[in-house]
């Protein structure tokens, strides 16, 4: 039986999960992320009627990393037709690491989905073609959805990622060789790394993503962010591809559409009810927040929520 939400439930879940801290590893392949305090743990929930619940380090900002891939897809959906987007990127889970080159080579430069690095780079390449200032536009979108006007990029993280971008550059050039990348590689990479370097808190992420629980409508903006069908499609992609190669395990344990980032954040959606954001910087072997997944697992068990 489903139970009512309150902050005490969230605080109790964090207490249960905190012993897991120390078992994962903070992302160290991006030097600017390697210095993050691995003991941080937070959760925030925003409901479709605007209620906010939080516990732990829910108001501390962190690098959202690949969570931004959902936002770049949303922006692309507002500027490109369905046919234009999906002829350049697929909708299937990859089953491979998020920065794999092998699968991309075998599949003629068409990424499996927009939530692996190759797919997100294609989406950023598309945005470069239709937006005069892609980085500024993303800030406008995030600030509008969250209702917070000072959200910004962590330029130190963006620079650190660009200085260690050989693999992502290789992905972009490989797609360019197949004709699926149209703009200057360096320019698009810079935009991509800035998107990943957005600094947001769990509270801000939950408010930003509640439109996916609310049929495409943000709770404080009159104009829909996406159509109800697009919201459903994005949730479906998150369910199949948002946790990289661990999507099946996550579906088994948590049962919600979600998107993770190597900054330790995860955003999960309960359709028609709420958006959930968790943060714990220590990652498992697949690059997902180890304690964050455990928090979501306990939450869905206690609340009786699942899309399955």
From Swiss-Prot:
It catalyses: L-glutamine + H2O = L-glutamate + NH4(+). One of its GO terms (molecular function) is glutaminase activity. The keyword Transcription does not apply. The keyword NAD does not apply. Its EC number is 3.5.1.2. Gene3D superfamilies: DD-peptidase/beta-lactamase superfamily (3.40.710.10). It holds the Pfam family Glutaminase. Keywords: Hydrolase. It is an enzyme of class 3 (hydrolase). One of its GO terms (biological process) is glutamine catabolic process. It comes from the Bacteria. Substrate binds at residues 66, 117, 161, 168, 192, 244, 262. Homotetramer. Belongs to the glutaminase family. This is Glutaminase. It comes from Shigella dysenteriae serotype 1 (strain Sd197). The gene is glsA.
